[in-house]
Design a protein with these regions (language model features):
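Aromatic- and carboxylate-lined catalytic core of secreted/periplasmic carbohydrate-active enzymes
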Residues: 324, 341, 349-387
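Catalytic domains of carbohydrate-active enzymes, especially glycoside hydrolases
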Residues: 59-88, 199-204, 285-291, 343-350
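Aromatic-lined carbohydrate-binding/catalytic grooves of carbohydrate-active enzymes
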Residues: 75-124, 214-217, 288-293, 304-305
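Extracellular glycoside hydrolase catalytic/binding regions
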Residues: 224-231, 250-298, 327-340
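Mature N-terminal, pre-catalytic/accessory segment of carbohydrate-active enzymes
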Residues: 2, 6-80, 84, 386-387
Length: 387
């Protein structure tokens, strides 16, 4: 901000400061009792009552939002993930999911991936963007509609392979991830984020550093922080530019990197991998922070230290959908409520749900997620004082 102010006259200074203040107030004042993250690939291979991969219709896509943003639901914010190294839409910057796979690899795809690829191809061939529909339905129902962007997905599947990965072997970190120590990687990732924000009529974007929390190969911590600070600041400036054109502040949220479940994430462990949350909040770049585990629910996530260190922005606590890797370990309604109580007691400003819908991915053994808990997870227990 200081560098920008040296370039404008005194008459414009008050306007810039007033605009920034108005933007900040709008971004921070919003209530988010429950934030619901949609994995953009999973929701395009299953549907309500499905027992396996199915052809998804436009009505199915709209129903995805109806299921979580129904009357009485406490879901105030819906996040739609549109990438995992690949993009889930035809991109001029990146690679559409599955298009870099060879015919031999496609022949080995599981039925779920084959159906997902077919669904995406069919929608876009007809000129229908299912993610634009999801965001539009979310806003029509009066909810905040955000994109979610996985910063460095490392699943490593062939259908997540990108042209950038193929063309830049020097930028690889392993198993599909990229080395953010490379200028070319940070430029590429920024351009992907910018493309998504400009493409979709969204209220902002979440940068998901928890998918996956590895970013650098052989760079010292201070250099990691400087590199990531530059990327986040650039993202904030881009959002402000786009937001001015849309007449509203576009939100920037961050889901912090975990420790792969070894220990709960802390500000120190995040900074070690390049994510200086305190600096991002202090600079005004970030509007909210999500703290969560990696994959499995532990019921012990401390939020108070984050609240103490990051005054001025809400800190939300994430619930993982399962206690382990089997169908039997998915959270029951009571376990979701237990997890929410723990987060509220530990200082959370709201509840964040990730992979909630993945019970539908068990094909013949698929079952519906407990949508009924969306009515109460966002209620702060009476015994827990408001911040």
């Amino acid at each position: 901000m200081r560098r920008r102010l040296t370039l404008i006259g005194a008459g414009a200074l008050s306007l810039v400061l007033f605009g920034a203040g108005a933007f900040a107030a709008d971004g921070l004042a919003r209530t988010r009792r429950v934030l619901y993250n949609f994995d953009g690939d999973s929701c395009l291979a299953t549907r309500a009552g499905g027992k396996g991969p199915v052809a998804v219709t436009l009505d199915d896509v709209k129903r995805l939002i109806e299921e979580v943003a129904y009357e009485g639901s406490q879901v105030d914010t819906v996040l739609v993930c549109v990438n995992a190294q690949v993009m889930y839409y035809p991109s001029t910057v990146g690679t559409l999911r599955g298009t870099q796979s060879t015919p031999a690899e496609r022949a080995r795809w599981p039925a779920s991936e084959a159906q997902r690829f077919e669904n995406l191809q069919r929608f876009f061939a007809k000129g229908v963007d299912p993610y634009a529909v999801m965001l539009s339905e979310t806003r029509r129902r009066g909810r905040e509609a955000l994109l979610s962007f996985r910063m460095n997905d490392a699943h490593g599947n062939d259908f997540l392979r990108t042209k950038f990965w193929t063309d830049h072997p020097d930028c690889r970190l392993g198993n599909g991830a990229l080395d953010f120590g490379r200028d070319a990687v940070r430029e590429y990732v920024f351009r992907l984020i910018e493309e998504a924000v400009r493409r979709y009529d969204c209220d902002g974007i979440e940068l998901d550093f928890n998918r996956f929390p590895t970013f650098f190969k052989d760079v010292a911590p201070a250099q990691r922080v400087a590199a990531m600070n530059g990327l986040v600041e650039r993202g904030r400036a881009m959002l402000d530019e786009v937001g001015r054109g849309r007449g509203r502040r576009l939100v920037l949220g961050v889901r912090v990197p975990s420790n792969y479940g070894r220990t709960p994430p802390t500000l120190a462990t995040c900074r070690e991998v390049g994510c200086d949350l305190a600096a991002w909040v202090k600079s005004g770049s970030v509007d909210f922070v999500v703290v969560s585990e990696f994959m499995f629910e532990r019921y012990d996530l401390p939020i108070h230290p984050w609240k103490d260190a990051l005054p001025g922005v809400p800190v939300y606590g994430g619930i993982e959908c399962t206690e382990g890797g089997s169908r039997a370990l998915y959270l029951t309604p009571e376990k979701y409520r237990r997890a929410a109580r723990c987060l509220w007691q530990n200082g959370a400003d709201g509840i964040y749900l990730f992979n909630f819908f993945t019970t539908r991915e068990y094909e013949a053994d698929a079952f519906e997620p407990p949508f009924e808990v969306l009515r109460d997870l966002g209620t702060r227990p009476a015994a827990v004082p408001a911040p």
